[in-house]
């Protein structure tokens, strides 16, 4: 190597190391009483706050997070959306990458800040996401994004302003909230023999209220046609906006268990008790960044499907699940539990105070949520603006509906990656058919026809360290194995299992890699290969510009119509990765599967501090 070449190498290494820095964080997890919606219950605090602190890093930073468990129960922390390339021991999934952190103990997570974008972190121990351990993550990118912003505006000042706005966004962690802890909530379902999913509030950045607008008002807020299409004539919601818990359309079946709706405590399904508290306020400055502001939304919901809008303001959706997309302009958007969205808003309206409407848009409950976007200096102004959504999330006009993002409609969910990134065409190397639904009880969920993923699966012998522990056992039905360097298709079928022909959506999240949704259609999957399905139903597939995400929604099916989806990904990140529904009740009920990606290139050099024996 010449002297000049060596000099260039030294310079390159210097700047690489100068850019990537080591960032150390400390998270102390405690359990105490709080009242984020004005009604007291016990919940999880992180460093004394709820929700957990926002963590901001630069791409490729070396991250070290020490988690101290100061509760009387187990905990882990999952870094949702981070690929954990070469660090599968830091994914934070009990039974796969680690043992749970016992009370009084600590665990140190080490990983690269990658990929850039909007992510989040949360507990992955049983249903404890319900209890409040979640916070936003922002990884600021190295690269230039001029090509992204130029799709929104060709003005050079605007492009620079949007880059600056995206570098320092507003963070909105949106969560649903119940008066019951996760353990209490799950016990209500198992005691009553009914899947219970009624909530009390929608919170934004840990703030919200309990609204009781009256049963007649809530009945009028039902999505048009929902009762007629899905439920018996005359079905009415409760004064909390919830459907009757014992409806066959909700509970499925028949199941060989006894339904005991009388064991559902008061105020779970009905008996609304209002509380005034406070809603989150987002102060924005139109004098900064040429009037552009970026907002990062995290759907830290456990059951609800969230819709958001800002009165009188359109927005450009430019990032989903930490992956940049070709921007599109909307006035409202629907987020599924687990997803993250980033939007760019032009502050071009009359300075004032504008309502942010953030209701539950799912068919589970009519439930409103609110925050305020306030132009700086207008904190004392009266609210102004045009509403795009009603209390229950219905569009206020046909134009609003035309300009809204719906993940279950392929014509609006055509959010292709930027820069272009598409999967291999033709057949994959491996195909796995996963049949989703309920088995045996309304709260038991499977991903492979019959097996339920236990919440303590392999907790003592995590699969990262014991990848063959389930072989020759019935539990091997909970494990998929793939080869490194292969293209894999995951085919998800819903609404075909006995007793589960009426199926609510599932929000399917894969750890360790993003997937392209290349196909979506109605009916029963009865093809010998994806390639055969493409030949027979080309209109149901897209391999040129499919979306790329880590969380996808399956179809809502009431009335027996089956649906399937096809997700494709490339195996280049060996490790044990959980693939599961991000609705906490469904995961607690068994809707998960362990995917051991790259078993032929399994991590061999695991740092000694992470070894278990």
Swiss-Prot record:
Domain Plastocyanin-like, residue spans: 29-142, 171-359, 468-598
Entry annotated with the keyword Oxidoreductase: yes
Main location per the UniProt record: other
Pfam families: Cu-oxidase, Cu-oxidase_2, Cu-oxidase_3
Residue numbers binding Cu cation 4: 506, 509, 581, 586
InterPro entries xref list: Cu-oxidase-like_N, Cu-oxidase_2nd, Cu-oxidase_C, Cu-oxidase_fam, Cu_oxidase_CS, Cu_oxidase_Cu_BS, Cupredoxin
One Gene Ontology cellular component annotation held by this UniProt entry: cell surface
Glycosylation sites: 74, 256, 279, 444, 468, 484, 526
Pathway annotation: Pigment biosynthesis
UniProt binding sites for Cu cation 3: 124, 511, 580
Segment forming the signal sequence: 1-20
Binding note for cofactor: Binds 4 Cu cations per monomer.
PANTHER family: LACCASE-RELATED, MULTI-COPPER OXIDASE
Function, in words: Laccase; part of the Pks1 gene cluster that mediates the biosynthesis of an anthraquinone derivative pigment that contributes to conidial pigmentation that provides protection from UV radiation, heat and cold stress. The polyketide synthase Pks1 produces 1-acetyl-2,4,6,8-tetrahydroxy-9,10-anthraquinone though condensation of acetyl-CoA with malonyl-CoA. The dehydratase EthD and the laccase Mlac1 further convert the anthraquinone derivative into the final conidial pigment.
Family recorded in the similarity comment: Belongs to the multicopper oxidase family.
Name of the protein in its database record: Laccase 1
Species of provenance: Metarhizium brunneum (strain ARSEF 3297)
């Amino acid at each position: 190597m010449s002297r000049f070449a060596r000099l260039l190498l030294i310079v390159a290494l210097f700047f690489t190391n100068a850019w990537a820095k080591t960032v150390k964080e400390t998270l102390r997890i405690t359990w105490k009483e709080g009242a984020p919606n004005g009604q007291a219950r016990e919940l999880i605090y992180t460093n004394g706050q709820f929700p957990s602190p926002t963590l901001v890093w630069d791409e490729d930073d070396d991250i070290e997070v020490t988690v101290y468990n100061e509760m009387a129960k187990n905990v882990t922390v999952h870094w949702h959306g981070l690929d954990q390339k070469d660090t599968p021991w830091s994914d934070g999934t009990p039974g796969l990458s680690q043992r749970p952190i016992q009370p009084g103990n600590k665990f140190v997570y080490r990983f690269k800040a990658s990929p850039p974008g909007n992510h989040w972190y949360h507990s992955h121990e049983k249903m404890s996401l319900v209890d409040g351990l979640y916070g936003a993550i922002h990884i600021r990118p190295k690269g230039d994004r001029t090509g992204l912003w130029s799709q929104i505006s060709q003005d050079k000042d605007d492009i620079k302003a949007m880059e600056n706005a995206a570098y320092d966004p507003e963070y909105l962690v949106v969560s649903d909230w119940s008066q019951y802890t996760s353990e209490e909530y799950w016990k209500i379902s198992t005691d009553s023999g009914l899947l219970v999913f009624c909530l009390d509030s929608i919170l934004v950045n840990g703030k919200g209220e309990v609204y009781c607008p009256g049963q007649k008002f809530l009945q009028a807020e039902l999505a048009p046609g929902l009762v007629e299409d899905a439920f018996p004539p005359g079905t009415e919601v409760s004064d909390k906006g919830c459907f009757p818990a014992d409806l066959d359309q909700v509970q499925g079946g028949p199941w060989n268990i006894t339904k005991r709706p009388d064991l559902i405590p008061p105020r779970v399904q009905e008996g609304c008790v209002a509380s005034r508290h406070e809603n989150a306020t987002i102060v924005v400055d139109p004098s900064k960044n040429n009037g552009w502001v970026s907002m990062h939304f995290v759907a830290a919901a456990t059951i609800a499907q969230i819709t958001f809008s800002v009165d009188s303001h359109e927005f450009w959706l430019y990032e989903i699940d930490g992956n940049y997309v070709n921007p599109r302009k909307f006035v409202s958007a629907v987020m599924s539990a687990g997803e993250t969205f980033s939007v760019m808003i032009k502050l071009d309206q009359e300075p004032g105070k504008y309502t942010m409407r953030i209701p539950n848009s799912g068919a589970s409950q009519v439930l409103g949520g609110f925050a305020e976007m306030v132009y700086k200096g207008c904190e004392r102004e009266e609210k102004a603006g045009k509403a795009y959504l009603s209390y229950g999330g219905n569009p206020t006009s046909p134009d609003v509906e035309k300009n809204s993002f719906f993940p279950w409609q392929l014509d609006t969910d055509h959010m292709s990656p930027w820069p272009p990134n598409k999967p291999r065409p033709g057949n994959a190397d491996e195909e796995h058919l996963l049949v989703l639904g309920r088995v045996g009880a309304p709260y038991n969920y499977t991903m492979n026809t019959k097996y339920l993923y236990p919440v303590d699966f392999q907790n003592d012998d995590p699969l990262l360290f014991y990848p063959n522990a389930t072989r020759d056992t019935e539990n091997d039905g909970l494990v998929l194995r793939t080869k490194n360097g292969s293209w894999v298709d995951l085919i998800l079928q819903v609404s075909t299992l006995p007793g589960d022909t009426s199926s609510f959506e599932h929000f399917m999240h894969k750890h360790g890699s993003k997937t392209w949704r290349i196909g979506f259609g109605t009916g029963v999957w009865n093809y010998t290969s994806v390639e055969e399905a493409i030949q027979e139903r080309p209109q149901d597939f897209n391999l040129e510009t499919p979306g790329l995400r880590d969380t996808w929604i399956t179809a809502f099916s009431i009335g027996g119509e089956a649906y399937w989806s096809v997700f494709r990904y490339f195996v280049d990140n060996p490790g044990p990765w959980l693939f599961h529904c991000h609705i906490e009740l469904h995961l607690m009920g068994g809707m998960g599967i362990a995917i051991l990606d790259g078993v032929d290139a399994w991590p061999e050099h695991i740092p000694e501090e992470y070894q278990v024996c």
